[in-house]
């Protein structure tokens, strides 16, 4: 369980947080440069990263539900007073991203941005459900850790800069591959 948790935390903090700005950058490259970059391949890579992340997250939820001795907490959250947030979390984190198995949806930038936003919202609903049910059950706010964040504006700047850099790297990779294919055929 710790391995799954570590993998999802690494993906969430290092890659997934920057998907929305990265997808916007890919969309801008698609609009501004028409057929210059292989944006469909980049979108396909992003889609499969989202699908793999969703499968790992789903396995983590299933493992927690079946094998952890506190599995009652999962069913209690799904049927308790904050059930709406739990089901929003499942919809955003597990159900909606699996629609990317359909190629027609996978190649639409707007839909990918929507799915990325829904997944990020699902992650926040997950934290909300865990913290609020803990406070509701224990009536003790000391048990919930409060995270210190950077100022909001700097945080947003970092997200967009790193998202744009990731998009440029991804598009550059496909551009270099295309150049090597052309060079090897001549």
What are these regions (language model features)?
Residues 123-134, 174-180:
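Transmembrane-helix bundle segments that line or gate the permeation/cavity pathway
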Residues 1-74, 79, 86:
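Long, contiguous internal "core" modules enriched in hydrophobic/ aromatic residues
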Residues 73-89, 141-169:
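Membrane-interface transmembrane-helix boundary segments in multi-pass integral membrane proteins
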Residues 31-35, 171-186:
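Membrane-interface capping segments at transmembrane-helix boundaries
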Residues 100-113:
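Membrane-helix interface "capping/anchor" motifs
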Residues 110-123:
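Central hydrophobic cores of alpha-helical transmembrane segments
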Residues 62-71, 126-140:
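Membrane-helix interface motif
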Residues 14-28, 88-100, 157-177:
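Hydrophobic cores of alpha-helical transmembrane segments in multi-pass inner/ER membrane proteins
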